[in-house]
């Protein structure tokens, strides 16, 4: 590797080449210093110290000779390491070095010693240096290492030492020193700037003079080398080229002219670029790409409001660079310190070569479209190069930058397949070999490809990076070559490996990804602790095959060596045990999860021989004792790490409806299947307080569309108005009268949101200390507002004064010529013969001892004013009270002339008739009453029209004596106060009592004597609107005056939204068992439909909650609930649902994984969102939220985790660690293994080797397959839906087609076949 080459010092080229290069560099440096100023003056003593450093390279006699000759200014001296010969006498300078641990390595002098630096390599976050010291074993006590952020010095007991100045800064406080077998010393150096690629381990002396210190904001993720300085970057002077020494070492002396020509071209290209005010390098921009045919690749870059005048795309053979400015506020907020004038740059190193001249781009309103023309017609399988070799070390970076923005499922670029990845790696290897051999193979490349990227110095603000800690490796026996190979194979960050869809296996992929982010389960399987607990003799298990297969798959997901991994082995193991998972049909993710965890439990069950146990009832014993006995009985048969981590316990309570026998048992659970509230409907309910002075309040109450009861409304209103539900009455009003009064158990399924519901607060007998009379009250006018212009029976219009129409005296709404017409029309009219009501009816509750006429009238008038408008017109002197009938009024016809047969056939006789005033031309026949128009609400009583005040004669029947007025009084406009109305001699209304036989009787005012009213009667409030009376009132219905409840404003929006608390409440609510689930009562000796209630008793460390979104009514009627269920991401408190023994700390949980389901019952797609919690705190994450969409893995924000598609939730309990079993050998854990078990153990060992060897490249073309299996898929990978809604539409169409086909097969086909046989 080049790291080792660097350790031996620079290889000298021919003297002529060195002199020419040195002169050219000195000349360019002089020009640069005259333009920008001397960098030594700017940085002060730092450069002075570097200039005075004179280390000697080991094994380089020329360097030693140069030092002896006093040549101190040579530009080819390299600060690499500082070894000193062992066994030589210590000089005073060396003694001073041994005393000071942090001495500046710049001032050390070295003598030639054997080579110490063996190799070095780097990952995304750290650099590992390997030193070989001697032959014998090496102890940490013999090593003295001193680190700073820029350099290090390592001394050994034998007198050797090594050190130097690093290419970039490190975290000196986190540096580690470890010893390995074979006298190896490993130095682990965490990078201060993660994801920054180091071209070399140590820096050259001349580089320190021209490269400024690394900025902590320099976080470049992507290509390892910038092949040309672009607009916005400071051009690197040719003399300061950091790779120039390395290039000189690798060149062939015969190719010097070509090399100098390349450097000259690079310098000329660099000086042509002007430096702008600011330039920000972007590690990632939201994008996607796809291959358009065999010759093109289309890239969509999603940036809005781009300034087209200053934006452009630069193309080269192996990369392209987007330079742009944007005014998009959302984009600028992601980059603090940046504004509309900030220039951004995003460079992408491509997977294969392109034709720059044939590439195009265009700007749209919301994105940039880039079309890349391939140099060769071949399938890329991805956009960016997966990895590259820089400085001799293979850099482990993702195929593409880790996205910082969320993308919908299927919106990310396709990953690189394994075969293409292998070809790319071989291409990199051959390219590296060609560069080492000479310039012949390099001459075809562009000159700028040899320029190593210079660290950015003009970053406006720190950019976010993906800080992914590597997965801890277990100690490996033997050499560390295997570990080094895995590091070199890394192509993505740990935890960003997807799973290939083998064919409708998205349900399996989502479950595996969620379980792989369960911290305790991941660590348990990764460090192979589970091997000590494999139960090889369990007939219910797989002999350890499932556990080992799951461990291999889990390790592959966290090694970062695959973009996507095929879970085919695990699927085959599962299918061998459960035949329903054979093939490529769709399955329920929760069903697969339950089987997988149960299979892992059986493979890891610590119980070798399961004893027989029985379920024991409580029999009146304390719950604590019964629960502990049940748990220990369960652990006698089931004891594994899966039980310790996932299983809890709930209390089941059954009550017999006949004998009231109570049975209490305690059962374990692996997950909680919580039901979802049914679809909601919002009902408007008007609440009337007990006292009429409080204005009614309109509430919006959400109830279930099916199986809802009045108790739901009463309970909701009870919480809002703080009144007990038993003191509330709910009634439905239709056409101004009570349609029905609901009991709490009555159903509301037939009530629609357009119906009118009234809720009344009633006085309780406990509060009144006596009997309370509850009365229904309805309102109606004395004279209805129905026009009468013709006979209702013969339809003959009134012709003359002598032929007057007569009204029906019961309803006053129809008229007849005579009694014969009335008798003819009576069968049709009797169902509608009732008075016309106005306003809203209401309920009043009065203590029996205070039920006086004055109190009753006050309550009635107080409630009535909210739904009717009342106006008393001014008094007219010419109007007098009617003492007798009008002279022109005809005598009432008697009903005695009806035939007896008719009376027997119809016990309800037609009422008497009353004359109607003749209708004039154009007269409506209406009494002069303020009638409410049908087209809108009635105006307020403050404005009275002249039509309302007009009066006209009307013929009426004889009036009761109580209705006569003794003297005229001046009328008071507007509504009168109840006290005034009571004191007035003429009331505005009359009160009638209606008994159970529907007979009416007017109530008389008895002063302070209470009225005797039974519970079976109701009241009618009759308004005096007869214009023939001296003091009449104008009355009409109006819209109910009420106040809006502010808390109900968002009830309509929340109708389709539920909370997890509501679901848990439904889970713990008692329910009646269905007939097919009847419980056998041991006391009745019969099956009973008992009531059952489940309550949580013992909570697990990892709580899995399934939202029961699927409902199966029949084969055809199946449904999925897609309503949003709001669940907490942080701090789920289950203390109110757990009735077990209370602990000191509340049972709080944090979400770490979600399985989502898109689509319907027939077709759908599963994805998963997950994060890796910290091992000590579930609130923190070692790896943030990611979206797993089969083989595509992208980062998402935590705010996007809660969606309406969530199906299975994974919660981790706070401050409740699960102790893992100690790792032990199989013989120690199972000392009595028989030959069969030993054979199974040997087979398990072979499984390890077989499954680990299965980590082969993903075959090209694998992906979401059809139901015919992987071998039947040909062609490129199909792209998933861009957004979840698009996927839902696709699955909805497919589901509809499948439902129609099923309907035809089940309904029409049998009919056709039957008719054919007939």
UniProtKB/Swiss-Prot annotation:
Signal peptide positions (record): none
Binding site for Zn(2+) 1: 791, 794, 817, 821
Keywords: Endoplasmic reticulum, Hydrolase, Membrane, Metal-binding, Phosphoprotein, Protease, Repeat, Thiol protease, Transmembrane, Transmembrane helix, Ubl conjugation pathway, Zinc, Zinc-finger
Domain USP per the UniProt entry, residue ranges: 497-1214
Entry's transmembrane regions: 1292-1312
Zinc finger (MYND-type): 791-833
Residues annotated as catalytic: 506 (nucleophile), 1165 (proton acceptor)
Binding site for Zn(2+) 2: 808, 811, 829, 833
EC assignment: 3.4.19.12
Protein known as: Ubiquitin carboxyl-terminal hydrolase 19
Source organism of the structure: Homo sapiens (Human)
């Amino acid at each position: 590797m080049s790291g080792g080459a660097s350790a031996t010092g620079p290889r000298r080229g021919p003297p002529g080449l060195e002199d020419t290069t040195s002169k050219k560099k000195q000349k360019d440096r002089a020009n640069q210093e005259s333009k920008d100023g001397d960098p030594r003056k700017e940085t002060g003593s730092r450069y002075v110290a570097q200039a005075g450093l004179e280390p000697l390279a080991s094994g380089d006699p020329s360097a030693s000779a140069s030092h002896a000759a006093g040549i101190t200014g040579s530009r080819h001296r390299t600060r690499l390491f500082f070894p000193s010969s062992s066994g030589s006498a210590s000089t005073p300078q060396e003694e001073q070095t041994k005393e000071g641990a942090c001495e500046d390595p710049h001032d050390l002098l070295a003598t030639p010693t054997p080579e110490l630096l063996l190799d070095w390599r780097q990952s995304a976050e750290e650099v590992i240096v390997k030193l070989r010291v001697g032959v014998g074993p090496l102890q940490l006590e013999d090593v003295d290492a001193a680190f700073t952020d820029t350099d290090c010095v390592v001394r050994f007991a034998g007198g050797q030492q090594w050190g130097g100045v690093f290419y970039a800064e490190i975290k000196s406080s986190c540096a580690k020193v470890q010893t390995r077998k074979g006298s190896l010393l490993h130095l682990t150096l965490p990078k201060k700037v993660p994801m920054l690629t180091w071209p070399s381990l140590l820096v050259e002396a001349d580089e320190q003079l021209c490269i400024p210190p690394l900025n902590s904001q320099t976080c470049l993720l992507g290509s390892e080398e910038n092949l040309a300085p672009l607009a916005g970057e400071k051009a690197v002077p040719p003399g300061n080229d950091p790779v120039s020494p390395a290039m000189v070492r690798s060149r062939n002396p015969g190719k010097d002219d070509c090399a100098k020509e390349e450097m000259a071209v690079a310098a000329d290209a660099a000086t042509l670029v002007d430096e702008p005010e600011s330039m920000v390098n972007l590690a990632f921009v939201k994008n996607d790409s796809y291959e358009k045919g065999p010759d093109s690749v289309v890239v969509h870059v999603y940036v809005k409001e781009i300034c087209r005048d200053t934006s452009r795309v630069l193309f080269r053979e192996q990369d392209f660079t987007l330079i742009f400015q944007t005014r998009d506020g959302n984009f600028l907020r992601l980059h603090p310190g940046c504004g509309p004038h900030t220039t951004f740059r995003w460079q992408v190193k491509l997977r294969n070569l392109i034709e720059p001249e044939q590439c195009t781009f265009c700007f749209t309103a919301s994105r940039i479209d880039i079309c890349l023309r391939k140099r060769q017609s071949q399938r890329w399988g991805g956009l960016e190069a997966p990895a590259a070799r820089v400085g001799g070390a293979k850099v482990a970076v993702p195929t593409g930058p880790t996205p910082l923005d969320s993308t919908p499922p299927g919106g990310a670029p396709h990953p690189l397949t394994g075969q293409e990845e292998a070809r790319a790696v071989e291409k990199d290897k051959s390219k590296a070999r060609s560069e080492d051999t000479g310039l012949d193979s390099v001459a075809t490349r562009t000159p700028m490809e040899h320029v190593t990227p210079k660290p950015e110095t003009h970053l406006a603000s720190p950019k976010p990076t993906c800080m992914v800690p590597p997965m801890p490796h277990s100690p490996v026996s033997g050499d560390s070559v295997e570990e080094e190979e895995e590091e070199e194979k890394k192509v993505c960050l740990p935890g960003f490996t997807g799973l290939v869809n083998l064919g409708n296996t998205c349900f399996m992929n989502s479950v595996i990804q969620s379980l792989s982010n369960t911290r305790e389960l991941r660590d348990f399987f990764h460090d192979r602790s589970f091997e000590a607990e494999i139960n090889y003799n369990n007939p219910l298990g797989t002999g350890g095959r499932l556990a080992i297969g799951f461990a291999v798959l889990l390790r592959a997901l966290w090694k970062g060596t695959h973009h996507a991994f095929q879970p085919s082995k695990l699927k085959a193991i599962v299918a061998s045990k459960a035949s329903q998972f054979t093939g490529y049909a769709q399955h329920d993710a929760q069903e697969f999860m339950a089987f997988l965890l149960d299979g892992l439990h059986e493979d890891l069950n610590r119980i070798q021989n399961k004893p027989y146990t029985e379920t024991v009832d409580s029999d009146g014993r304390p719950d604590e004792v019964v629960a502990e006995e049940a748990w220990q009985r369960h652990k006698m048969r089931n004891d594994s790490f899966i039980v310790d981590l996932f299983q809890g316990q709930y209390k089941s309570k059954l009550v017999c409806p006949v004998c009231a026998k109570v049975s209490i048992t305690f059962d374990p659970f692996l997950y909680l299947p919580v039901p979802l509230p049914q679809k909601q409907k919002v009902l408007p309910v008007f609440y009337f307080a007990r006292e009429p002075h409080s204005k009614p309040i309109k509430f919006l109450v959400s109830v279930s569309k099916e199986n809802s009861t009045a108790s739901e409304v009463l309970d909701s209103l009870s919480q809002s108005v703080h009144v007990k539900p038993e003191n509330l009455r709910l009634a439905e009003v239709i056409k101004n009268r009570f349609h029905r009064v609901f009991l709490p158990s009555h159903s509301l399924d037939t009530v629609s949101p357009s119906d009118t519901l009234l809720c009344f607060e009633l006085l309780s007998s406990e509060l009144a200390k006596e009997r309370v009379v509850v009365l229904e009250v309805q309102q109606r006018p004395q004279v209805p507002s129905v026009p009468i212009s013709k006979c209702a029976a013969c339809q003959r219009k009134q012709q003359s004064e002598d032929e007057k129409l007569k009204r029906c005296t019961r309803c006053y709404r129809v008229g007849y010529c005579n009694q014969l017409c009335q008798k003819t029309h009576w069968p049709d009219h009797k169902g509608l013969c009732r008075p016309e009501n106005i306003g809203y009816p209401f309920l009043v509750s009065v203590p029996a001892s205070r039920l006086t006429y004055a109190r009753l009238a006050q309550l009635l008038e107080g409630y009535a004013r909210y739904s009717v408008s009342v106006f008393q017109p001014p008094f007219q002197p010419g109007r007098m009270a009617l003492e007798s009938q009008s002279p022109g009024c005809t005598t009432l016809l008697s009903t005695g002339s009806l035939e007896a047969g008719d009376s027997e056939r119809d016990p309800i006789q037609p009422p008497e008739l009353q004359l109607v005033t003749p209708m004039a031309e154009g007269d409506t026949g209406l009494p002069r009453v303020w009638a409410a128009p049908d087209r809108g609400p009635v105006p307020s009583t403050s404005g009275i029209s002249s039509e309302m005040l007009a009066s006209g004669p009307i013929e009426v029947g004889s009036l009761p004596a109580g209705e006569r007025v003794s003297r005229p009084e001046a009328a008071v406009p507007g509504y009168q106060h109840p006290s005034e109305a009571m004191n007035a001699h003429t009331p505005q209304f009359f009160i009638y009592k209606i008994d159970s036989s529907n007979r009416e009787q007017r109530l008389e005012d008895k002063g302070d004597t209470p009225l005797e009213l039974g519970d079976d009667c109701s009241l009618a409030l009759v308004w005096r609107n007869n214009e023939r009376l001296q003091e009449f009132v104008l009355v009409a219905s109006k819209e109910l005056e009420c106040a809006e409840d502010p808390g109900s404003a968002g009830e309509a929006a929340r109708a389709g939204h539920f909370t997890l608390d509501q679901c848990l409440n439904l889970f713990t609510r008692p329910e009646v068992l269905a007939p097919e689930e009847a419980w056998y009562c041991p006391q009745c000796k019969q099956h009973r439909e008992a009531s059952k209630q489940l309550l949580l008793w013992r909570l697990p460390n990892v709580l899995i909650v399934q939202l029961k979104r699927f409902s199966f009514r029949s084969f055809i009627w199946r449904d999925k609930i897609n309503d949003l269920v709001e669940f907490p991401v942080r701090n789920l408190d289950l203390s109110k649902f757990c009735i077990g023994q209370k602990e000191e700390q509340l049972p709080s949980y944090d979400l770490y994984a979600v399985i989502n389901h898109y689509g319907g019952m027939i077709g759908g797609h599963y994805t998963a969102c997950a994060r890796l919690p910290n091992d000590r705190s579930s609130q923190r994450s070692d790896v943030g939220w990611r979206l797993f969409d089969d083989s595509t893995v992208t980062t998402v924000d935590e705010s996007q985790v809660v969606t309406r598609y969530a199906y299975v939730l994974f919660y981790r309990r706070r401050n409740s660690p699960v102790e893992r079993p100690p790792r032990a050998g199989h013989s120690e854990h199972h000392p009595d293994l028989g030959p069969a078990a030993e054979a199974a153990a040997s087979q398990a060992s072979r499984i390890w080797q077989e499954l680990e060897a299965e980590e082969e490249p993903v075959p090209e073309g694998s992906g979401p397959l059809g139901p015919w299996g992987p071998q039947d898929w040909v062609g490129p990978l199909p792209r998933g839906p861009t957004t979840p809604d698009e996927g839902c539409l696709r699955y909805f169409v497919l589901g509809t087609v499948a439902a129609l086909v099923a309907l035809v097969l089940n309904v029409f086909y049998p009919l056709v076949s039957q008719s054919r046989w007939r």
